Amino acid sequence: MVDTAVVDTALLEANQLSYHVQGQKLINNVSLQIASGEMVAIIGPNGAGKSTLLRLLTGYLAPSEGHCQLLGKNLNSWQPQALARTRAVMRQYSDLAFPFSVSEVIQMGRAPYGAAQNRQALQEVMAQTDCLALAQRDYRALSGGEQQRVQLARVLAQLWQPEPTSRWLFLDEPTSALDLYHQQHTLRLLRQLTLEEPLAVCCVLHDLNLAALYADRILLLAQGELVACGTPEEVLNAETLTRWYQADLGISRHPESALPQIYLRQ
């Protein structure tokens, strides 16, 4: 049994979550906790159920069994506006059919607040995500990586508050289209925010080395089950990764942090 216990100040708690469609169980008996100030990475092979789990943890899907609580309250009991001010979700794909400017897309994140302090919030998150130079461009004309940065700015705008407030941010592969600089910049930013604010970040990552460098804890999902949970040192070992990824790989050490780094054998 995987030990997923963290500190008593858990921001989110999932208890025995299962989800099935037409007799097929996509998520099976997953329990976990995520604490304020934590950065958690969800990893796993293709088809493991990572995106489905993310949707269960954010209330976009109702579990077939089990329940998920945010700040001690079941997700389905939250009022939509209050939930939108407390948690934000960056999905893997966010296409738009209409000619919105970048600033208009980011401003959509402020919908739960009306006009309250929008200008300050937008300027701050656009600067954080390197989007200021993109502000007046048509979102549809951006590269995939630029669109990802805009979507990150949007969800950060959604959670922006003038005073420290417990918040919850979920991201589905937020670095998949980014170049090396912006991968590093994005994960450094998220890490910094969890250290400075009462913010919990949980993101799906395919790059195990990025997960090792920036996550406090890693959740390994396989075949819909949580098969490993712990620090990068505890989860990212050759035996565990070879078993669940079925890849011929090895583990080395980062020359500066000594954290595990994964390489594929030729």
From Swiss-Prot:
Pfam family membership, one: ABC_tran
Annotated binding of ATP, by residue: G44, P45, N46, G47, A48, G49, K50, S51
One of the record's GO cellular component terms: plasma membrane
Main location: membrane
Domain of life: Bacteria
InterPro entries: AAA+_ATPase (IPR003593), ABC_transporter-like_ATP-bd (IPR003439), ABC_transporter-like_CS (IPR017871), P-loop_NTPase (IPR027417)
Leader peptide range in chain numbering: none
EC number(s) reported in the record: 7.6.2.-
Keywords for this protein: ATP-binding, Cell inner membrane, Cell membrane, Membrane, Nucleotide-binding, Translocase, Transport
GO molecular function list: ATP binding; ATP hydrolysis activity
Domain ABC transporter, first and last residues per copy: 12-248
Family annotation (NCBIfam families): PRK13548.1
Oligomeric and partner information: The complex is composed of two ATP-binding proteins (HmuV), two transmembrane proteins (HmuU) and a solute-binding protein (HmuT).
Function: Part of the ABC transporter complex HmuTUV involved in hemin import. Responsible for energy coupling to the transport system.
Name of the protein this chain belongs to: Hemin import ATP-binding protein HmuV
Organism: Yersinia enterocolitica
Source taxonomy: Bacteria, Pseudomonadati, Pseudomonadota, Gammaproteobacteria, Enterobacterales
